Amino acid sequence: MNTEETNVDLQDAETRDAAEPAAAEPEEAAQPAPAADADATEADVSEADLDQEEQEKQPMTGGGERPEDAPPAAAEAEKNGSVKLKIPEEEEEEQQEKFTGLNKEELLRVAGTPGWVRTRWALLVVFWLGWLGMLGGAVLIVLRAPRCRDLPATNWWNDGALYQVGNIAAFSAARDLKGLEQKVSSLSQLKVRGLVVGPIHVAPADSVEALSFEEISPEAGNPEQFKGLVQTAHKKGISVVLDLTPNYQGSSGPWFSNTSVTYVTERLKSALVFWLDKGVDGVLLSGVERVASVVPSQWADIRAIVQNGTEERPNKRVLIGVTERSSAEDVSSLLSSTGVDLLISRVLRPGSTDAMEHARSVQLLYSAHSQTTLAWGLGGRAEGHLASLVGPALVKLYQLLLLTLPGTPVINYGDEIGLMDEGNKFPKMLWDSDEELNGTLQEERAERLSCRSFFRSLSERRVKERPLLFGDFLLLSNSSSSLAYLRVWDQSERYVAAFNWAEEAAVLQLSGAALPQQATVVLSTNSSDLPADSSVDLTNLRLGPGQAALLKFPYTG
């Protein structure tokens, strides 16, 4: 039913309703009445008709008058079931007022107009031109930027210091391998990369017949303790190197006599396989020049067993040699002939304060060999501890020297705290405790803690700074009592290490194209004289007696 039919029906209904009272009027009018009453009756009828029409216009509510704040009558009528009618013309006007956008066909027609086509092409051209411009700029930046140097090939023993424990009983209160295992966490705090243990095998002095490489001396511990030590060290990121020097307690030499070298090396080869299968990460041998020259074929086999990886042992193992030679030329020749991964020598002569000799030896070895094969140490099983060799006042100076030279530093146990030899080369290790101490002992304890803190700071910086790990070595200044060198790597910060061995102050005048005028103090053996983070003049660098300092300055291109 359409709208017009609905309107007609409603109009017919209203006509019938209005006709009923109209039909009653003639009946009343037919009765005789006075003229005045007739006029009154007609007025009443007119008022009644008007009232009825007004009531029909009001909504069907429960009665009563509509309050003033009530909604409009039309809204109430819709709520009470009344129908609000709209003619077609009004609907068309409302639809025209509500714009809902273009449909698909209209959009396609508009998009195909010349104006929009030109706009799209212009925006597309701008986009691709911008993209190509950014690409070209990126390529130009890459081409013009300085290339980073490729990192050198290094091994785990080049990443930090090696820590030697030559006497297990002297290192801890437990006096065995279990006690050493309990101190691994303390060694980890020093950022050492390797732990050199022993010798711990059975080897009565000068008795080649009683030699047993594969048996642990009862004084050192047992196989289970050694297994626990290796596992704990590996968890802390520390590799374990085993000292297998044959005659380490005798006086006839580390390899006994020349006639017994062949017999000893044959037994050593089987022992190497045994210990490498136990998880050790390398082997140290003293007197390598003797075995390499007397039985070169046997020495080649030893090298192959340790240095060549297998499916069972894919990780790289280190072969460390030890020699008593001190001449830089002899050490360089031996390093080439033996083929060891590291060679510990006496190039840095104990007690020598000749800075010019130190500089010459370091420069010769550095120029002849890769720094990944160089090792620097002072003291050891045969020589004793650093503090006894150079004096307590120079311990920090030599710590700085060992940890900043190009190569691997090798530290004897206790050197980090300035431990002194007491009647023998294996003094008892001193560990910090909370027990009450008198004045003198308190001062000694404070000095040990200061020395250890200095070593730890140096070691931490060495393992994370590329110039100190594998950077180039440049000699800046050297005299009979002072030395300064530069460590640089690519675009990293530059480090200057300066030393004064003299008993009086020295002034170093460091200048050159690679040096700025100012540098920042990183560490100093005398922090009150050269505090950390202070600025110094490199052209007028003053060092006190026995003082050393590590400085840095930024890369400037």
PLM regions: where:
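Substrate-binding cleft of carbohydrate-active enzyme catalytic domains
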Residues: 188-192, 215-253, 263-264, 271-276, ...
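Conserved alpha/beta catalytic core and glycan-binding cleft of carbohydrate-active enzymes
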Residues: 255-257, 303-434, 489, 497, ...
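The substrate-binding groove and active-site-proximal loops of carbohydrate-active enzymes
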Residues: 164-175, 209-223, 254-266, 281-296, ...
